[in-house]
C-alpha cells in the first residue's frame, strides 16, 4: 500500500490561497454542502487509485490545488474538516526526528518579511519528490522510513537498499540520520517549460510497490536537505555529508543576503535545466534548534517560496459563445482569475463547439488550464463538474455560416460585429481610428442596422454618440468618407469574398456576379468547393443588396 500519499497535505492550513479568487462562492448552504461533498469524493477516488494501484490519475499540482480548493470551500461555509488527510500515510515506524514540513509562501512581499530579521540564510531548490529518513549504523544503511505524517512512516528499507543513489555504506563508520527527498531523475528538466511532469507521483508509486525493480530503482535520485544532529553551520553539514558519500548538494545551496538574492536563485533554477522537478525554493537559516525539539509542523527557521503553477485549477464563471465572421462558433470560458507563470488569466478558449459539446462545460465547473508556448492560455481538461448544471443558450452550428448575419438581429450580434471588425481592419479597408470598440459604440446607439449604414452617418450624428468627443468624431467621419475611395479589390475582401487563389478577377461587380460555378472552377487554384462558395457569395440576396448600396455611394467597381 502506498505510504506517502500527497506529502504536503498535512500542512494545508499554512498555504496561501493567492492562486484562487479571494471571494467565496455565492452558494446557498445546500449547494455548498453538495459541492464540497462532490470534490471530496473526487479526491477520494484519486487517493484510492494512488493508494491501491500506485498510479496517479491527475497531475500533482492539480491534486494539490484541488485540496486547497476543498479547504477554501470548507472555510468559506464553516463546514467541518474531514479526518486528517495523512492518516493513511502514517505507518508503524517512528521517526527518531520529526519531519517538520514547511510554510508555503507565494509572494515576494511575504518572503521579504520572513527574511527581515534573519541572518545566515541559504537557499536550495525545493525538489519535488517524496521525503524520507535514512538511518545509518556504523556507516551502513540500517533503515529507511517514509515521511508519513511526520511522526511515523512506513518502512522503506527494502526498496532503499536497491536504489543506487542512496549510499549503502558511508566512507566512515558513523551513526547518522539524514532527511532528504527521493526524486525521479529527469534529464535537463526546465521547470518553467515542463512543469512537474508528474515526477512526484512517479517515484511515490514506485516506492509503494512491494518489489522495486532494478531499472526503476536506477531512475530514483536522492537530495539530502538536512542532517538534524550535524554541525551547527549549514555549509559544514553539506561538506561533511558529501565526504560521507552522499550526492553533493553544494551547487544547489547558495547564500542569501537579501530578497534580490532569493529572487535571483528562484528565477535561475526555475528556468535552468536540472536533474529533477522542483516546485519552488527553500530558504533556511543555517542555525536551528536541537533536533529533539523538532515537531511535525512548519518551523520558524525554514520556509518554501513556491513557483507559479504551470497548470492551474480554475473556476468557470460563465460560458460565452463567440461567433466569428465566417460563422465559426468558439466557446470561451470566463474564469475566476488564476495565476499562471506570474500572469493573471481570466478567460480561455475551448477551441470549437464540438469540443465544448464533448466536455459539456458549465458555470461552476473546475477546469485545468496551462499556457501553450508559455503565452496563450489553453484549456486542458475538466477536473470537477458542478453539481448543478446551468442551462445555456447554445447556438446551433447549422444557423451560422459564411453568408449568415448581415444584420444585428437577435442571435446575430456576435457575427455581425465580427463582420464590421473585419471590414475596417487591415484585412479589409484598413480604416484608421476604427476598431471593434468603435463598432460596439455605434451598435449600442442603434445606428447600424446593416453592414454599410455607417456610410451615411454625418458629423452631428457622430457628435451625439456618448464617448465620442469632437476630435474623435471628426477623425471617425474622415475615415468613413475615405472608405469610398478604397479600390474595388479591397472592398471585395472587406465584404468577405471567399479566397480566390490565383484567379484573375474582373474589375467590376457585374462581371464577377455573372460567373457560374463551372467558370469559377476553371480559374487557377480554385477547386469545386471554393467555386461553389464564390458562386453562392455573388448570388446571395444580402450581398447583392450591399453591392447596390456601394454602387449608389459611388464606390469604384460597383
UniProtKB/Swiss-Prot annotation:
* Species: Pseudomonas fluorescens (strain Pf0-1)
InterPro entries for this protein:
DNA_ligase, DNA_ligase_B, DNA_ligase_CS, DNAligase_adenylation, DNAligase_N, NA-bd_OB-fold, NAD_dep_DNA_ligaseB, NAD_DNA_ligase_OB
Pfam annotation, one family:
DNA_ligase_OB
Identify a single GO molecular function assigned to this protein.
DNA ligase (NAD+) activity
Q: Which NCBIfam families match?
A: PRK08097.1
Q: Which residues form the active site?
A: 126
Encoding gene (name): ligB
Catalysed reactions, semicolon-separated: NAD(+) + (deoxyribonucleotide)n-3'-hydroxyl + 5'-phospho-(deoxyribonucleotide)m = (deoxyribonucleotide)n+m + AMP + beta-nicotinamide D-nucleotide
Which domain of life does the protein's organism represent?
Bacteria
State the top-level EC class: ligase
Any GO BP annotation: DNA repair
> What UniProt keywords apply to this chain's record, in alphabetical order?
DNA damage, DNA repair, DNA replication, Ligase, NAD
Q: Does the keyword Cytoplasm apply?
A: no
Q: Where are the transmembrane segments?
A: none
User: Which family is this protein grouped under?
Assistant: Belongs to the NAD-dependent DNA ligase family. LigB subfamily.
Q: What is this protein called?
A: DNA ligase B
Q: Which SMART domains match?
A: LIGANc (SM00532)
* The keyword DNA repair belongs to this UniProt entry's keyword annotation: yes
Function noted in UniProt: Catalyzes the formation of phosphodiester linkages between 5'-phosphoryl and 3'-hydroxyl groups in double-stranded DNA using NAD as a coenzyme and as the energy source for the reaction.
- Write the Enzyme Commission number(s) for this entry: 6.5.1.2
Amino acid at each position: 500500500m502506498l505510504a506517502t500519499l500527497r506529502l504536503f497535505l498535512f500542512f494545508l492550513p499554512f498555504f496561501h490561497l493567492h492562486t484562487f479568487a479571494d471571494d467565496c462562492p455565492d452558494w446557498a448552504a445546500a449547494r455548498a454542502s453538495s459541492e464540497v461533498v462532490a470534490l471530496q469524493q473526487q479526491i477520494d477516488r484519486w487517493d484510492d487509485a494512488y493508494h491501491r494501484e500506485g498510479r496517479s490519475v491527475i497531475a500533482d499540482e492539480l491534486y494539490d490545488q484541488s485540496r486547497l480548493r476543498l479547504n477554501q470551500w470548507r472555510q468559506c461555509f464553516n463546514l467541518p474538516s474531514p479526518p486528517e488527510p495523512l492518516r493513511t500515510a502514517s505507518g508503524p515506524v517512528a521517526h527518531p526526528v520529526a519531519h517538520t514540513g514547511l510554510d508555503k509562501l507565494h509572494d515576494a512581499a511575504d518572503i521579504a518579511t520572513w527574511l527581515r530579521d534573519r541572518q545566515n540564510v541559504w537557499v536550495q531548490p525545493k525538489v519535488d519528490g517524496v521525503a524520507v529518513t535514512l538511518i545509518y549504523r556504523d556507516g551502513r544503511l540500517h533503515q529507511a522510513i517514509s515521511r508519513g505524517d511526520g511522526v511515523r512512516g512506513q518502512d522503506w528499507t527494502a526498496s532503499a537498499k536497491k536504489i543506487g543513489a542512496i549510499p549503502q555504506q558511508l566512507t566512515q563508520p558513523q551513526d547518522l540520520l539524514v532527511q532528504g527527498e527521493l526524486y525521479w531523475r529527469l534529464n535537463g528538466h526546465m521547470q518553467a517549460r515542463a512543469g512537474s511532469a508528474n515526477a512526484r507521483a512517479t517515484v511515490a508509486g514506485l516506492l509503494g510497490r512491494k518489489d522495486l525493480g532494478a531499472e526503476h530503482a536506477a531512475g530514483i535520485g536522492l537530495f539530502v536537505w538536512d542532517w538534524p544532529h550535524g554541525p551547527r553551520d549549514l555549509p559544514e553539514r553539506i561538506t561533511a555529508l558529501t565526504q560521507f558519500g552522499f550526492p553533493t548538494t553544494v551547487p544547489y545551496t547558495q547564500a542569501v543576503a537579501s530578497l534580490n538574492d532569493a529572487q535571483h536563485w528562484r528565477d535561475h533554477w526555475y528556468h535552468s535545466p536540472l536533474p529533477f522537478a522542483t516546485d519552488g525554493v527553500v530558504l533556511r537559516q543555517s542555525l536551528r534548534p536541537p533536533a529533539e525539539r523538532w515537531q511535525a509542523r512548519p518551523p520558524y527557521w525554514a520556509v518554501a517560496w513556491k513557483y507559479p503553477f504551470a497548470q492551474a485549477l480554475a473556476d468557470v464563471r460563465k460560458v460565452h459563445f463567440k461567433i466569428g465572421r465566417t460563422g465559426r462558433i468558439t466557446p470561451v470560458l470566463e474564469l475566476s482569475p488564476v495565476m499562471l507563470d506570474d500572469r493573471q488569466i481570466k478567460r480561455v478558449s475551448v477551441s470549437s463547439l464540438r469540443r465544448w459539446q464533448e466536455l459539456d462545460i458549465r458555470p461552476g465547473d473546475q477546469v485545468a488550464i496551462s499556457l501553450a508556448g508559455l503565452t496563450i492560455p489553453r484549456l486542458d481538461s475538466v477536473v470537477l463538474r458542478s453539481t448543478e448544471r446551468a442551462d445555456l443558450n447554445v447556438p446551433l452550428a447549422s444557423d451560422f455560416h459564411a453568408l449568415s448575419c448581415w444584420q444585428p438581429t437577435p442571435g446575430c450580434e456576435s457575427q455581425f460585429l465580427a463582420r464590421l471588425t473585419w471590414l475596417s481592419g487591415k484585412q479589409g479597408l484598413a480604416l484608421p481610428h476604427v476598431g471593434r470598440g468603435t463598432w460596439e459604440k455605434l451598435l449600442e446607439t442603434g445606428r447600424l442596422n446593416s453592414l454599410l449604414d455607417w456610410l451615411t452617418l454625418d458629423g452631428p450624428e457622430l457628435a451625439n454618440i456618448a464617448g465620442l468627443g469632437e476630435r474623435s468624431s471628426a477623425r471617425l467621419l474622415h475615415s468613413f468618407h475615405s472608405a469610398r475611395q478604397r479600390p474595388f479589390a479591397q472592398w471585395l475582401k472587406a465584404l468577405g469574398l471567399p479566397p480566390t487563389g490565383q484567379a484573375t478577377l474582373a474589375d467590376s461587380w457585374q462581371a464577377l456576379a455573372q460567373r457560374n460555378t463551372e467558370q469559377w472552377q476553371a480559374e487557377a487554384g480554385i477547386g469545386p468547393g471554393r467555386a461553389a462558395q464564390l458562386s453562392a457569395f455573388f448570388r446571395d440576396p444580402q450581398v447583392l443588396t450591399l453591392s447596390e448600396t456601394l454602387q449608389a455611394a459611388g464606390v469604384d467597381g460597383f
